[in-house]
From Swiss-Prot:
The lineage of its organism: Bacteria, Bacillati, Bacillota, Bacilli, Lactobacillales. This is DNA-directed RNA polymerase subunit beta. It catalyses: RNA(n) + a ribonucleoside 5'-triphosphate = RNA(n+1) + diphosphate. It is an enzyme of class 2 (transferase). It comes from Leuconostoc citreum (strain KM20). GO terms for cellular component: DNA-directed RNA polymerase complex.
Length: 1204
């Protein structure tokens, strides 16, 4: 027997075909959410208040400081928040201290800062009763970036951008003549030397002293930069030039220029690199990285002992760098301090680290490498040393030293997770509040004011509310199944505020990059406009403190060349320096490599390399892909486009009534279900004392009792059924973190998205043409693919101008048969079976005398009394919404429920539908092999196996070769063997069962080695010509169900302007008869059919009414009138000032209105006069009154539509 047994949880054992030992467990899969939010609570809030406060008033008398914060107990727990459509949030109280510097008085006070949403253990937020997820954002990291473009002559031109987290951008570039320019915040160009002068290095000799005179671009720029105004010093002149670029047209003085530059770059409140920006700049400008592979043009010695570290002319390789490295970290090694002139922007001295090197293009030429000194990593603004070192890197690029940056490299893109996104939003609110506080400080009496009086929390509350309610990154959670839910929490989006937009994103940003390896899944991404912009975090990926994605590698011992079990997490930048072997490189038991050379990755190259050069090794073959993709067995045999569809469609699988975990899994099913948040997980070890369908009680080892309440038949976000079932029994011992109860789409603790039917690849009467699926009726009868769907419907009783609405059983014009399931208040009973149009909540609305309809006016004219003045506004079951009433909730202010203003009562009705699989439903396997059910065949007519077993599903064999998803065929064969052997198997991605192992399993199960079987026709009993591939495959029913899509319109709403029927099921719209359909009817010469489609059935308003009348009276259909859209066209052209007229045969203008007139239709007023003047009309036969009435009705309809 190939393979070995592996236990997944307590309840499932699989035969695993993995040959690679797992050295690292898959991490907690929703940690990306929970850890980030925890950071926000522990550090983010303090950091943010630290940035904004202390707030001083304009005179410097008062100062408001942050002391501490505290989150109180939430008002509602998670379930109550769901039930009341409320937020799961806690009151945030902040302790503030107000100091009066004149009197020395200090006041401390707790200030309420609004309700702050809390994250649930599952990594979600509950906002207005609905679960939401904050998607992590993939953005460009702050830092300094160098790029290269070629001009039209093919000469390289370099550019540099310093990007802060917030604040002004600083850019350097060379023009066509090779002169170096600077732009501040995308304004007009300025010579680079002018910015250096503004920093306090005014003379040409100062500039050459810093940079040396060996750079052509610098020398040409100095030539162009002449002293224009002798009355100003060079520094002041440069400052004014900078000011003129930033504020053109305003009067410029040296002082205002200084203040402006300080505000733009050196004021921490307006310019922020964030810790990640400082880290990136220090890394990019550090001499450690820049000296590597350069030749020294001076001898470097130990400053203390004078001992030579490296001679002049030495090439600095890794060995030399390891000796140099400790010295480069010292603040006294090769550093020079420059003091700016007194009229500079900043007066502090600038320390630079400088080392001379040979030019690679001309060894006679000596160039300088200038580092930015040792700037503290807590310094969040850009410093003059950064600007000068950045200019030096820029000048060196033109001499062939240094590298340009790839902006799609994951070393230059970082993740903003929940905590940081929240912090940024909160900061916006606090900044708005800061202005208010300052104003109030200057208005109120400094001696009596308290922190509470200064603070206005409204901007803070509004910013947080807006973020959770309407930000692009705060999304309604996909809760179709556990995989979809977990995937949503691990999603990485490049869209959203501060990110890209769909239209601007090019192909490069969307493409797979070599740094995605082990960090971002190259497969799972949506098809369509968002392709490549929305990604998924790889299985082992994690996010470091700077927001870069790290992936784990096993360290290889440099001396013994053995693979150790020590794990290092590397960012994309760090990985570029190492050679990494693949996880499937064969190893001996002691960790040494079997072969002398192995396949490895170095940068973007895949190379075969000797083992003594290997630094690291992958931890697992599945570290490349995300959890969704890792759940596809034989992924390595599928084309990537189909694998993408497979990974995406697994998220759309509907939770079934009785799901089964796949017979052929990959081993990730247990971990995926466990971490998704839908399973009930034990908090501590103990013994199960009690189990039923609603709760599990576990007695801990310390005697404490834990009670776990299970979710029963709750409606999930997607309208699916959310139900938990216990899988432990009384007396069982459970460990901490063990699965106690399965959630939806789970079985025995594992993910179970579908079923394991018997599938054959064969055609059947053409019914599986074009990916259609032939189903066995047994799957319908035995509820194999049956799912439960729960929909909620609300009805509110409001106060209207004419009086309150009322929930009641007394509904006008309604028969007793429609009221049979309503109680005295008009509310449906739980358990009632309802169909389209049935009343769920009886409700009447008072009706004003003003809005009498035509019939009532007629009745009023005839009988002279008012009908009961209420209108039926009951909540009815919409089309396709029938089912069984599962629950009814009544909300009233008397019960302490918070309702919207003007609402006296709200009733919410939940209707459950049991949907069996039917023709038109979409189904799919895990390999992107999707199709729709085309026919359900009686069990006795289905093809059957030699032992009489009917096939469950027939798939078209044509769906395999061109799509190249061969994984499904391998799964089919291995699944059949597993079914026969009564086992579950695990075939992990890139390390699964080989062809030989599948053949061995088939042999072991006593099946033919090619996995094919003779199949007999169920209708004739004759064998089919050829043997057919038969086996077991995991097959799912997807959320695209025909019940949600089928739609037909009888009488429905019309668009206001064009009077044409609306479109779409939601609007109860019509079918669009488009341009090409018109051509088709024209081609057939079906003129009259076409005419009525374009008039009566569309927007001939008067014609519609007349046709209706004609049909009722049995008269011939009149000629059509003018379509409303033609009138709209005429009016539009007239609005453009064109004299457009409609002429008759004689050439006279015709009013469009005249074409609709019909004198036979009486206006209402005329009818009322008629009735009043002829009282004996009321004694006539009913038929005559009815005839008059129908005329009134039709006329009234015409009038209403004409007004529109």
């Amino acid at each position: 027997m190939a393979g070995h047994l592996v236990k997944y949880g307590k309840h499932r054992t699989r035969r695993s075909y993995a040959s690679i030992k797992e050295v690292l467990d898959v991490p907690n899969l929703i940690e990306i959410q929970t850890a980030s939010y925890q950071w926000f609570l522990d550090e983010g809030i303090k950091e943010m208040f630290g940035d904004i406060m202390p707030i001083d008033d304009f005179q410097g008398t008062l100062s408001l400081e942050y002391v501490d914060y505290q989150l109180m107990e939430p008002k509602y727990n998670i379930d109550e928040a769901r039930e009341h459509d409320a937020n799961y949030s806690a009151p945030l109280h902040v302790t503030l201290r107000l100091t009066n510097h004149e009197t020395g008085e200090i006041k401390s006070q707790d200030v309420f800062f609004g309700e702050f949403p809390l994250m649930t253990e599952q990594g979600t937020f509950i906002i207005n009763g609905a679960e939401r997820v904050i998607v992590s954002q993939l953005v460009r990291s702050p830092g300094i970036y160098y790029n290269q473009e070629n001009d039209k002559n093919g000469r390289p031109r370099y550019g540099t951008t310093v990007i802060p987290n917030r604040g002004a951008w600083l850019e350097y570039e060379t023009d066509a003549k090779g002169i170096a320019n600077v732009r501040i915040d995308r304004t007009r160009k300025l010579l680079m030397t002018e910015l250096v002068r503004a920093l306090g290095f005014g003379s040409d000799s100062d500039i050459i002293d810093i940079f040396s005179d060996q750079y052509d671009a610098l020398n040409m720029t100095l030539e162009k930069d002449v002293h224009k105004d002798m009355s100003d010093s060079r520094v002041e002149e440069a400052l004014k030039d900078v000011y003129e670029r930033l504020r053109p047209g305003e009067p410029k003085t040296a002082d205002s220029s200084r203040a402006l530059l300080v505000a733009r770059f050196f004021d921490p409140k307006r310019y922020d690199l964030a810790s990640v920006g400082r880290y990136k700049i220090n890394k990019k400008l550090s001499l450690k990285t820049r000296l590597l592979n350069q030749t020294l043009a001076e001898t470097l010695a130990d400053p203390d002992s004078g001992e030579v570290i490296a001679e002049k002319g030495t090439l600095v390789d890794k060995t030399v760098m390891s000796k140099l490295s400790p010295f480069l970290d010292r603040e006294d090694f090769k550093t020079t301090t420059y003091t700016p002139s007194g009229d500079a922007v900043l007066e502090e001295p600038v320390t630079l680290q400088k080392i001379k090197i040979e030019s690679p293009e001309n060894p006679e030429k000596t160039l300088l490498l200038i580092g930015n000194g040792h700037i503290d990593e807590n310094d969040r603004t850009v410093r003059p040393a950064d600007i000068l070192a950045g200019m030096n890197y820029f000048l060196n690029l033109q001499e062939g030293i240094g590298n340009v940056d790839d902006i799609d490299h994951l070393g230059n893109r970082r993740i903003r997770s929940v905590g940081e996104l929240l912090q940024n939003q909160f900061r916006i609110g606090l900044t708005r509040m800061e202005r208010v506080v300052r104003e109030r400080m200057s208005i109120q009496d400094a001696n009596t004011v308290t922190p509470q009086q200064l603070i206005n929390i409204r901007p803070v509350v509004a910013a947080v509310k807006e973020f959770f309610g309407s930000s692009q990154l705060s999304q309604f959670m996909d809760q179709t199944n556990p995989l979809g839910e977990m995937n949503h929490k691990r999603r990485l989006s490049a869209l959203g505020p501060g990110g890209l937009t769909r239209d601007r994103a090019g192909v490069e940003v969307r493409d797979v990059h070599y740094t995605h390896y082990g960090r971002i899944d190259p497969i799972e991404t949506p098809e369509g406009p968002n392709i490549g912009l929305i990604n998924s975090l790889a299985t082992y990926g994690r996010i470091n403190k700077y927001g870069f994605i790290e992936t784990p590698y096993r360290r290889v011992d440099w001396t013994t060349h053995m693979v150790t079990d020590k794990i290092d997490y590397l960012t994309a930048d760090e990985e570029d320096n190492y050679i990494v072997a693949q996880a499937n490189s064969p190893l001996n038991d002691d960790g040494s490599f079997v072969h002398d050379t192995v396949m490895a990755r170095f940068g973007e190259e895949n190379i075969e390399t000797p083992i003594d050069r290997i630094d690291y090794m992958d931890v697992s073959p599945k570290q490349v892909v995300s959890v969704g993709t890792a759940a596809i067995p034989f992924l390595e045999n599928d084309d990537s486009n189909r694998a993408l569809m497979g990974a995406n469609m697994q998220r759309q699988a509907v939770p079934l009534l009785d799901p089964h975990a796949p017979l052929v899994g990959t081993g990730i099913e247990y971990k995926a279900a466990h971490d998704s948040g839908v399973a009930m997980i034990s908090r501590a070890a103990g013994v199960v004392e009690y189990v039923d369908g609603r709760q599990i009680r576990v007695r801990r080892e310390d005697g404490q009792l834990d009670t776990y309440e299970l979710m029963k038949f709750r409606r999930s976000n997607g309208g699916k059924n959310y139900n938990q079932k216990p899988i432990v029994h009384e007396g069982e011992h459970v460990e901490a973190d063990e699965v106690l109860a399965d959630g939806p789409s789970m079985e025995k603790g594992e993910l179970a998205l579908g079923q394991n039917p018997l599938i054959a690849f064969m055609t059947w009467q053409g019914y599986n043409f074009e990916d259609a699926i032939v189903l066995n009726e047994r799957l319908v009868r035995e509820d194999v693919y049956t799912s439960i769907h729960i929909e909620e419907y609300d009805s509110e009783a409001r106060d209207t101008k004419l009086g309150p609405e009322e929930m009641t059983r007394e509904i006008p014009n309604t028969g007793e048969d429609q009221l049979k399931d309503l109680d005295a208040d008009g509310i449906i009973r739980v358990g009632a079976e309802v169909h389209d149009g049935d009343i769920l909540v009886g409700k009447v609305t008072p009706k004003g005398v003003t809005e009498l309809s035509a019939e009532e006016r007629l009745l009023h004219a005839i009988f002279g009394e008012k009908a009961r003045e209420v209108r039926d506004t009951s909540l009815r079951v919409p089309h396709g919404g029938g089912g069984v009433v599962q629950n009814v909730r009544i909300y009233t202010p008397e019960n302490g429920d918070e309702l919207a203003p003007g609402v006296n009562m709200m009733v919410r009705v939940y209707i459950a539908q049991k949907r069996k699989i039917q023709v038109g439903d979409k189904m799919a396997g895990r390999h992107g092999n999707k199709g729709t059910v085309s026919v359900v065949v009686p069990e006795e007519d289905m093809p059957y196996m030699p032992d009489g077993t009917p096939i469950d599903i027939l798939l078209s064999p044509m769906g395999v070769p061109s799509r190249m998803n061969i994984g499904q065929v391998l799964e089919l064969h291995l699944g059949f063997a597993a079914k026969k052997l009564g086992i579950h198997v695990a075939s992990p991605v890139f390390d699964g069962a080989s062809d030989d192992e599948i053949e061995a399993a088939l042999r072991e199960a006593g099946l033919p080695q090619d996995g094919k079987s003779v199949v007999y026709d169920g209708r004739t009993g004759e064998a089919f010509d050829k043997r057919v591939g038969v086996g077991v495959m995991h097959y799912m029913k997807l959320a695209h169900m025909v019940d949600d899509k089928i739609h037909a319109r009888s009488i429905g709403p019309y668009s206001l302007v064009t009077q044409q029927p609306l479109g779409g099921k939601a609007q109860f719209g019509g079918q669009r008869f488009g341009e090409m359909e018109v051509w088709a009817l024209e081609a057939y010469g079906a003129a009259y059919t076409l005419q009525e489609i374009l008039t009566y059935k569309s927007d001939d308003v008067a014609g519609r009414v007349k046709v209706y009348e004609s049909i009722i009276k049995g008269e011939p259909i009149p000629r059509p009138g003018v379509p409303e859209s033609f009138r709209v066209l005429v009016k539009e052209l007239q609005a453009l000032g064109l004299d457009m007229q409609v002429l008759d045969n004689a050439g006279d203008e015709v009013e469009l209105r005249q074409m609709d007139e019909d004198d036979s239709i009486l206006p209402v007023d005329a009818l009322e006069k008629l009735v009043r003047s002829n009282p004996d009309l009321l004694n006539k036969e009913d038929e005559e009154v009815a005839a008059a009435f129908s005329k009134v009705e039709s006329r009234d309809n015409t009038e209403v539509t004409d007004e529109n």
